[in-house]
Amino acid sequence: MRNPSTVVQENGSVSDFISQLGYFAFSSRFLNLNSEGCSGSSSHSLYLNGFENYRCVKRPPRSGASLSLSSRGSSSLRRFVNEFNNVIKFHCHKPPLGFASLGGVSDETNGIRDDGFGVSQDGALPLNKIEAENPKRVLILMSDTGGGHRASAEAIKAAFNEEFGNNYQVFITDLWTDHTPWPFNQLPRSYNFLVKHGTLWKMTYYVTAPKVIHQSNFAATSTFIAREVAKGLMKYRPDIIISVHPLMQHVPIRILRSKGLLNKIVFTTVVTDLSTCHPTWFHKLVTRCYCPSTEVAKRALTAGLQPSKLKVFGLPVRPSFVKPIRPKIELRKELGMDENLPAVLLMGGGEGMGPIEATAKALSKALYDENHGEPIGQVLVICGHNKKLAGRLRSIDWKVPVQVKGFVTKMEECMGACDCIITKAGPGTIAEAMIRGLPIILNDYIAGQEAGNVPYVVENGCGKFSKSPKEIANIVAKWFGPKADELLIMSQNALRLARPDAVFKIVHDLHELVKQRSFVPQYSG
């Protein structure tokens, strides 16, 4: 039986098999190439009729064409891959469908209609000649596939406001939900479904990892959503575009490149995964890629990004985490906690997911000293939007002090009131806990992007991993008792690894980048 505290390394042969499976599924089912090398489905063909100077040329049929493992089959496979890559390269350099209909602009009208909030409505691409007194416009691209992307976007927006005030206007948009047609606008809902069914998500993650798969997917997808995405991007007239999501690089960059705007708009990526991350995070044409760790920077280099485009600043978290922390006693009093007992923070994310109730009950038992008839610690539980869970926990008669909260906006105060934290391996929560010097017990992770966060925490001496509520409770009880020294050492390690000023370094570097293009005519018809 597998030890619940063991992190299983993703099997390389399994992921390779899945990648090959995904490749053949994509090439045979989506492309549906016939014997002439053309797609049998006109609606999904990568050889688009709209491009008159490029047509599918029929070739004489070849006898014995096969994808078998024989030498002839291997030759056919190599020939197919080469032809397939040529098609993808062609489509990555062609303007997306619908771009021509955006039309030109006149200098008199500037091609926009304003909605009263500084956001242009529809219209064509404006000719926006930046003046020194005009605020720069920042567009942050994210999607609600998990709470971390929005949290990073909000952190960057808050840092711009604190550091530069009215010199910057910052907009946050969910590009897929707000600016793509059905079914592409269902991305967050699809993600939530896949994550709840772990095997499906794991397969999706690894199938789309190979470059030949995700590059071709983006090229094909662009033909259907380019017009809407282009309008969605350009209505904000951005000076800077910041992507905080792995699916927000390839399609927007392709659109900007086809319009000749890549050397005029600062396009940057802020990676929000601490260690393991999907290859779609990286695109060679970004102006800058901000990495939260050296592990991610190494992956970016492997993906082909130039070292000069990389900055390792850390993960952006809310600026409120940088401010001096108030005394624990004061924070505990405000939160209704015991002012003297050591405290553990139990979290389940914004939706209050995971074994929170079972863990809280195990903590209540482990933190009660039967010999002396008194508690040795207390618990602060954050249930997020899960009101049913909060109601059940509040109805329990606990042996130790337990405070139950719903969705909280001042997480820095909750962390400041506690001595350690139990949470799943979300990168944002890990980064915030390290800033507060909280030893971390990870009780779960999402396969793929969060798998590497577990060894990142454990191997750096900042915490432990276990899926067993009973084992977790025993760890906390020892930290609050005979192993208090271990708790202190882990707290010091967390503070050493923390990067509280990451978000400010990011916005200041962005400020320097945009200053270099301050008087460049940005948008031309």
UniProtKB/Swiss-Prot annotation:
The keyword Chloroplast applies. GO terms for biological process: glycolipid biosynthetic process. It is found in: Plastid, Chloroplast membrane. CDD domains: GT28_Beta-DGS-like. GO terms for molecular function: 1,2-diacylglycerol 3-beta-galactosyltransferase activity. Its main location: plastid. Pfam families: Glyco_tran_28_C (PF04101), MGDG_synth (PF06925). Induction: By light and cytokinin. InterPro entries: Diacylglyc_glucosyltr_N, Glyco_trans_28_C, Glycosyltransf_28_UgtP. GO terms for cellular component: chloroplast membrane. Residues 1-103 form a transit peptide. It catalyses: a 1,2-diacyl-sn-glycerol + UDP-alpha-D-galactose = a 1,2-diacyl-3-O-(beta-D-galactosyl)-sn-glycerol + UDP + H(+). Its EC number is 2.4.1.46. Keywords: Chloroplast, Glycosyltransferase, Membrane, Plastid, Transferase, Transit peptide. Belongs to the glycosyltransferase 28 family. Involved in the synthesis of the major structural component of photosynthetic membranes. This is Monogalactosyldiacylglycerol synthase, chloroplastic.
